Design a protein with these regions (language model features):
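N-terminal helical capping/dimerization or prosegment-like subdomains
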Residues: 1-94, 323, 340
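Active-site metal-coordination/substrate-binding segment of hydrolases
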Residues: 77-149, 443
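Acidic, glycine-rich active-site loops and adjacent beta-strand->loop/helix elements
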Residues: 86-88, 151-159, 182-187, 210-212, ...
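Acidic/histidine-rich catalytic neighborhood of metal-dependent amide-processing enzymes
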Residues: 114, 119-197, 456
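Acidic-enriched catalytic cores of C-N bond-cleaving enzymes acting on peptides and small amides
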Residues: 187, 196, 217-307, 336-358
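Zn-dependent metallopeptidase/amidohydrolase metal-coordination segment
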Residues: 207, 231, 316, 320-324, ...
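C-terminal catalytic subdomain
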Residues: 233, 309, 314-344
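A short beta-alpha structural unit
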Residues: 330-333, 360-375, 399-400
Length: 457
């Protein structure tokens, strides 16, 4: 297998690869909004056609929600499953975008050329890196280097409600020697990374109800309970002055970081002042006895993501509201059980309610943390391949976010997961003006060709 010929083909094909990516990016496959259901179908159809054009047996597979795309190609050698997701986040607030989020374009910036648009980095640009590596390999050699399965999801950004039932129903077809997930990032702009630790996630939507209707604050203010005041007091008590979460038992299943891992993380270059300064901050707000990387990668969190109630429109209305609402998310680590944390949090909130107030709940998300099996030989081989491409030693890192599919592959298919991606910290995923560096896209494709060559041996 001549790798150099594949790399040359990739270099030559970059303009066409960018055109293909932009065609996919123009499809507004927002999975959380039912108005875009047809667009999610179109994105899945586009990917099926692209995979078939390379010689894969590919199909759009129905679910109760958005379809999965499953493709198979190659024979012999190890069996590798590649995962990505074709759905994207909503684009609100649209007014903050510099251009139409679904009219992607290449822009010149002080740091180089970038592709701007929703889904460029999360995750269409990323999944197209491995598809383009497959395309180049097939064009040069006439076949794939080993047995490949491609598994593309359409509900990752909306909680993956169809994922587990689909894995259970299709376990025999999808089970491979290892799952490879391209939905992570670089450690620094030119230092590749393999993510070995992921935080879990659960979300809660809380409504506190007091009076049975909105009241006039002149007629009832001071005498009637105000749910916004109750909610604000409870949320303010969620953390102590040192940043520790006050829900009873919250830290019971949180393991201390092994010293070897802590030492490796401390050896990584990480400029905390720049990390915070890039978003207009200067002082860490988490647990004050932890290093910044520990806060981000190995410690649990509780964050209020939204709070509302009463009158929030233009002008002024002296209302005493009937209800107050909040959305709270928890990032989980180690052995924390999402169901246990949810029950503890609800009990803690309800224990603080005054008379005449009730709490109602809506659950969002429910995934435990994940720790990857770095003793799998594929990790060392992939690390060497990334080092060869980027000219910098690839590093093992944690991630503050959640990629539940990694844990699902282990729990339901018995597969370890290898997480490699080429996103950069300033890609603005989930935010207006999302971008993906053209260099990340180009070298990401080359990286996958090198990984394929090493894993297929």
């Amino acid at each position: 297998m001549r790798l150099d010929d594949v790399l040359t083909r990739i270099d030559t094909d970059v303009p066409a690869a960018l055109d293909r990516l932009m065609a996919l990016l123009r499809i507004p496959s927002i999975s959380t909004d039912p108005a875009f259901r047809g667009d999610c179908d179109r994105a899945a159809d586009w990917l099926v056609a692209d995979l078939q054009s390379m010689g894969f047996e590919a199909a759009k597979r129905p679910t109760p929600g958005h379809p999965m795309v499953v493709a198979h190609g190659g024979t012999g050698g190890p069996h590798l499953l590649f995962y990505g997701h074709y759905d994207v986040q909503p684009v609100d607030p649209l007014s903050l975008w510099h251009r139409d989020p679904f009219d992607p374009a290449i822009e010149d910036t002080p740091k180089g050329r970038v592709l701007r648009g929703r889904g460029t980095s999360d995750d269409k640009g990323q999944l197209m890196t491995f598809l383009e590596a497959f395309r180049a390999w097939k064009a040069v050699h006439g076949s794939f280097p080993c047995r490949l399965t491609v598994f593309l999801e359409g509900e990752e950004e909306s909680g993956s409600p169809s994922l587990i039932p689909f894995l259970q129903a299709n376990a025999a077809e999808l089970r491979a020697d290892i799952a490879i997930i391209c939905d992570t990032g670089m450690h620094e702009d030119h230092i590749p990374a393999i993510t070995t630790m992921l935080r879990g996630l659960l979300g809660e939507e809380l409504t506190i109800t007091g009076p049975d209707k909105d009241l006039h604050s002149g007629s009832y203010g001071g005498a009637a309970i105000n749910p916004i005041r109750v909610l604000s007091r409870i949320l303010a008590a969620l953390h102590d002055a040192k940043g520790r979460i006050q829900v009873p038992g919250f830290y019971d299943d949180v393991d201390e970081l092994p010293e070897a891992i802590r030492a490796q993380w401390q050896s990584l270059s990480f400029d905390n002042a720049k990390f915070l300064g890039d978003v207009g901050l200067s002082v860490p707000a988490g647990e004050q006895d932890r290093t910044p990387l520990e806060m981000l990668w190995s410690r649990p969190t509780a964050e209020v993501n939204g709070i509302w109630g009463g009158y929030t429109g233009d002008g002024f209305k002296t209302v005493l509201p009937s209800e107050a609402h909040a959305k709270i998310s928890f990032r989980l680590v180690s052995r924390q059980n999402p169901d246990k944390i949810r029950a503890s949090f609800r009990a803690w909130v309800e224990s603080q309610l005054p008379p005449d107030c009730t709490a109602t709940w809506k659950a969002h998300g429910n995934s435990p943390a994940g720790v990857m099996a770095i003793d799998n030989p594929a990790f060392d081989r992939a690390r060497a391949a990334l080092t060869d491409e980027w000219g910098q030693p690839a590093v093992y890192v944690g991630a503050g976010g959640s990629i539940p599919v990694a844990r699902c592959f282990k729990d339901y298919l018995g597969m370890d997961a290898l997480l490699i991606g080429f996103a950069r910290d300033d890609d603005q995923i989930h935010s207006p003006n999302e971008k993906y560096d053209v260099e990340s896209f180009h070298k990401g494709i080359r990286s996958w060709a090198r990984v394929l060559e090493r894993l297929a041996r």
